[in-house]
């Protein structure tokens, strides 16, 4: 059974989620979001949204246009699901909260370009719990309409642009930010502008009728994005599409905590994890407020809050 730990406020820290690892504010006006998609993507988005509306529990929400990496991750992990495109990360999370989707597939970090912006507050604010994580190998393609000529500008999500920045600099191509990779491909297909290309998955090029000019242009040989699968804490998992991969036996807990910017404050706060043999696999800092008097940290630890050793470590964190 997967843990369904909800957000638990405990003075200076929050337990956000506990989940097994996989082996590998009001109603949103989501219908108006259709205008944010390029013309080439609108028909596909409308079709996918209509199918998801007929069977919301089978729907898995994602940010972006059809053909983006989140869409691919859903196809890999939930082959029997109904992908539900949403224009923003907040929209995807809201779709789950409003019952328009049973789950959401959200990227949180990349091996080349680090964490995905805003996830450290969007996820805990959503109140959803992590069911699983999924690691997707990323293959960025330079795509453009036939006859685009010499490419001088490229459109894509900032994460994709960051993962390919050295390649783009070496080829004297200027980067332009877009809401997502597949959406960039759709816009390039609509514009048919000389010299303009997109960075996107090959699937997006196929969907929007673009040529693949280059493949595998990331700045590292291994480019992997970590996704998390989120759902409501009280979700009946038997009602949702099954996860393709078997779950491993390892439980992970993610948490946020805040410490004052004083000597040894962080050391004292996390000392309990080491003392109780709890492995911390991730620790990131975020500035807390405008006073710069405290820092917020995001951490992943092995185990679940109900385990004695994890509970003891959390008690020490709580005390500090």
Predicted feature locations:
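Domain-level signature for soluble enzymes in the chorismate/prephenate branch of the shikimate pathway
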Residues: 6-320
């Amino acid at each position: 059974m997967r843990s369904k730990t909800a957000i638990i406020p405990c003075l200076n820290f929050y337990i956000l989620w506990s989940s097994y690892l996989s082996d590998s504010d009001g109603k949103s006006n989501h219908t108006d979001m259709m205008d944010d998609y390029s013309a080439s993507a609108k028909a596909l988005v409308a079709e996918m949204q209509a199918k998801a509306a007929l069977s919301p529990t089978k729907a898995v929400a994602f940010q972006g246009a059809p053909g983006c990496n989140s869409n691919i991750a859903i196809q890999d992990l939930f082959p029997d699901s109904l992908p539900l495109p949403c224009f923003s990360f907040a929209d995807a999370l809201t779709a789950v909260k409003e019952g328009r989707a049973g789950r959401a597939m959200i990227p949180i970090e990349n091996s080349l370009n680090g964490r995905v912006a805003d996830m450290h507050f969007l996820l805990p604010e959503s109140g959803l719990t992590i069911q699983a994580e999924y690691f997707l190998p990323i293959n960025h393609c330079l795509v453009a309409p036939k006859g685009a000529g010499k490419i001088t500008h490229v459109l894509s999500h900032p994460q994709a642009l960051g993962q390919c920045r050295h390649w783009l600099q070496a080829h004297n191509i200027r980067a332009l930010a877009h809401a997502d990779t597949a959406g960039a491909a759709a816009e390039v297909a609509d514009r048919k502008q000389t010299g303009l290309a997109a960075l996107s998955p090959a699937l997006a090029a196929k969907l929007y009728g673009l040529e693949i000019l280059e493949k595998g242009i990331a700045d590292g040989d291994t480019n992997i994005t970590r996704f998390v699968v989120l759902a409501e804490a009280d979700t009946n998992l038997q009602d949702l599409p099954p996860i393709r991969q078997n779950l491993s036996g390892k439980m992970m807990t993610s948490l946020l905590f805040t410490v004052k910017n004083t000597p040894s404050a962080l050391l004292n706060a996390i000392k309990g994890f080491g003392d109780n043999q709890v492995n911390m696999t991730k620790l990131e800092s975020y500035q807390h407020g405008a006073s710069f008097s405290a820092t917020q940290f995001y951490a992943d630890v092995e185990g679940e809050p109900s385990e004695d050793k994890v509970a003891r470590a959390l008690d020490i964190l709580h005390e500090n």
